[in-house]
Amino acid sequence: MIAPPVVSGIALERAVEAMRGMAYEHRLHILVMLRAGEATPSELAATLEVHPTVVAHHLRHLVDAHLVRRRRSGKRVLYSLPDEATARLIGDVLRYAGV
């Protein structure tokens, strides 16, 4: 029998935080949309057909979970995926779900 690899508690905590971040339909949908590129909260709200405050709430959680990056461009606030690893993770989740 092969011994499982040892994973640090910090790494496990980060993995749990990421999974919690995706555990809501709106959050996962936001992540899927951001795979296509940057978007404003208003653009995301229009696509989701929800009030912008709903999107703002979910974006806060996604930023806290390090699944989404926020940046300012003039008066606009843009959100995007932080890296290619996050985009692959979203793709893997969708494939697991049979999408």
Language model: regions and residue ranges:
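Short, intrinsically disordered or compositionally biased N-terminal tails of bacterial proteins
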Residues: 1-10
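Internal catalytic or translocation cores that form aromatic/hydrophobic pockets or channels
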Residues: 88
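Alpha-helical residues within the helix-turn-helix
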Residues: 46, 63-64
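N-terminal helix-turn-helix DNA-binding core of bacterial DNA-binding proteins
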Residues: 9, 13-53, 73, 77-85
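Residues within the DNA-recognition helix of helix-turn-helix
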Residues: 58
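Histidine- and aromatic-rich ligand-binding microenvironments
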Residues: 83, 98-99
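Alpha-helical "hinge/linker" immediately C-terminal to small N-terminal DNA-binding modules
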Residues: 91-95
